[in-house]
Amino acid sequence: SVGQYGPLVHFGGVIGDYFSKLLRDQTSPHILLASGAAAAISSGFGAPVAGLIFAHEVIVRHFSLKAVAPILISSVVAHTISTEFYKSEPLFQLNIGGISNFYEIFPLAILGLLSALVASLYMRGLTGFLPIPKKIPIFFLPIIAGSICGVVGLFYPELLGLGTGTIRLLIEQPHSLAYIAILLLGKLLLTVVCIRFSLFGGIFSPALFIGVMTGAIFSIITSYFFPEINYSLLAVAGMAAVTSCVIGGPISTILIIFELTSDYQVALGAGISVCFANLLSARIYGHSAFDQLLMNRNIDIHQGRDRLFLASKKISEILSRDFIRLVPEHSAEEMINILSKADNSEGYIISPKGKLLGKINITALI
């Protein structure tokens, strides 16, 4: 019940990291890593522009002119090659339609807030504390997860795999409220079980699935009061809102929706839900599930790249013993002679017991 796009992005990032080690100091490692991730998004979704923005928004964490060219080239080349070998239409090229009147903005905004709650619940399950009995061997956990998925799949096969067909079906036409609610709860729980029980996979595709279910449920309930509401638009907006909270990339999510649907109006409508969802999700949970996973490993990416680099460096790696050793018994003249012969301007006064007493500059001695 996990996705394939997360591992695809990781694979692209690993390739970028490999090339950064080959090139050493010729380019910034994070730019090549971001280029690999952008290429993965571009080829996986058929979305080269979204790949570019995703790399800047989620990985680089700022828009850099230095990084635009290599990331864009990687994204476009990956898209060109993938479409050459695998010709495919946009994943959700359906007749959805955009906002038809001003009053539809309010349901989209409310849907964004609801999606933030669902996304936060999903992310809490993925990253929060999960008490697993220590008696269960680690290698046995994936077997348990696989068994649970197998049993559930006998009754609801829609919950297994990427669920692309189910997503398309629910965007096109509504189904019973109970059925959609079961799919929403089932997908959320199954994905959490799979990830927490060490089954390898991504959380992006399940977020799309959960988001569509959220939007569909909200749209069906809203249609009781507003029969003319655009059901498909709300379903897609829910998908975008939940996904943007999970990956922490609102702009790239809107662009992914645009490139998946080939409909600018749909992207605009979904953008309203995305904005409200991220405002609330950032307050009640945080930036994204990925950030929290790093926080669980005591890596706070909000400190900035420089501070993270310093935190990862050991003093032993940069410690230098190349200094001029002076003793308190030296006279000023002796110190000047020692520093002059060593062609150095400063020395360190060390006691016989090896204690640092201070530093002295040659200009202070003259």
Sequence positions of predicted segments:
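Alpha-helical transmembrane segments and immediately membrane-proximal extracytoplasmic
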Residues: 1-312, 317, 321-357
